[in-house]
Amino acid sequence: MNKRDFPRVHFYDQDFVDIYDKSWAWIADYWTVGDARKGFPKDKFFHYPPSRTLDQLDQVFASFFLVYSNRLYAASNGLDALYGKQEESGAIRGSYDLESGEPVLTKDNPEGLAAPLFAWAEYNLYHKTANKKRVKEVMPALHKYHQWV
């Protein structure tokens, strides 16, 4: 296997293998460049186009899948886009409108709180990449976020 290619799946059910391969092809179509004027970094991150929001859960779960792309896709850029939206209080809202950069708040969830899964995602990234520098860089944001929660 080429280290600069996606991991290959060898499985008896070719339909399963085809879905796996197609999912990597679809991901290539769903990269969004952040807009610095709206508070997002200029790095590309995964985003499913029908939704016009950047969602915490989507980015956390995307990081679990993208970490297996052999660095063809950055698994942490979506998380970094959310860290970039962190407020002085430590708040990182669960969803942000990509057009305005504003948090999406509802009557049922006026704080925009989502499940606090950032630390879990970062643990997984560290477990797969052993990037100690990243842990050191994101720890202050995670600490502030958990104080807010």
Question: How should these model regions be labeled?
Answer:
Residues 1-54, 77, 81:
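Low-complexity, Ser/Thr/Pro/Gly-enriched N-terminal "stalk/linker" regions
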Residues 52-149:
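Aromatic-rich carbohydrate-recognition surfaces in CAZymes
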